[in-house]
UniProtKB/Swiss-Prot annotation:
Protein family per UniProt: Belongs to the mitochondrion-specific ribosomal protein mL55 family.
Protein name: Large ribosomal subunit protein mL55
Family matches, as InterPro entries: Ribosomal_mL55, Ribosomal_mL55_sf
Gene Ontology molecular function, alphabetical: structural constituent of ribosome
Residue spans crossing the bilayer: none
Modification sites for Phosphoserine: 86
Repeat found in the keyword field: no
Cited Pfam families: Mitoc_L55 (PF09776)
């Protein structure tokens, strides 16, 4: 089967080079060299990725992936979708967040009775 597939690919490339105009004959048409599997097995060759740091991404289901991220962290967790949780888990998470959601009491502002004229003598030149 693989010999048949490679023969068909060769015939297709030969047919494409004859049918294509002269300027398009030198285009890279083979897909077996630069597919996604090869790209994932090699290192990053570009200098534009020099400032990306390797971190561990934790998904909602608990699975982990090593990715590159612009900020230096060790672990990055994805937020949990509250709609997918059971009602008991949702209530437990809400109870945890209740302390953070409470409004802080605002302190009354102090009355400002500063008089500029009283201290003006200290910064004027004589």
């Amino acid at each position: 089967m693989s010999a048949k597939g490679s023969l068909l690919r060769l015939l297709w490339q030969c047919g494409m080079t004859r049918a294509a105009p002269e300027s398009c004959r030198y285009l890279y048409t083979s897909s077996w060299r630069a597919d996604c599997n090869r790209a994932s097995l090699t290192r990053v060759h570009r200098q534009t990725y020099a400032r990306l740091y390797p971190i561990l991404l934790v998904k909602q289901d608990g699975s982990t992936i090593h990715i590159r991220y612009p900020e230096p962290r060790r672990i990055l967790t994805m937020p949990v979708d509250l709609d997918s949780l059971s009602p008991e888990e949702r209530r437990a998470r809400f109870r945890k967040r209740e302390g953070q959601l409470k409004e802080k009491k605002e302190e009354p502002e102090l009355a400002d009775d500063f008089d500029v004229e009283q201290y003006k003598q200290f910064w004027t030149k004589k």
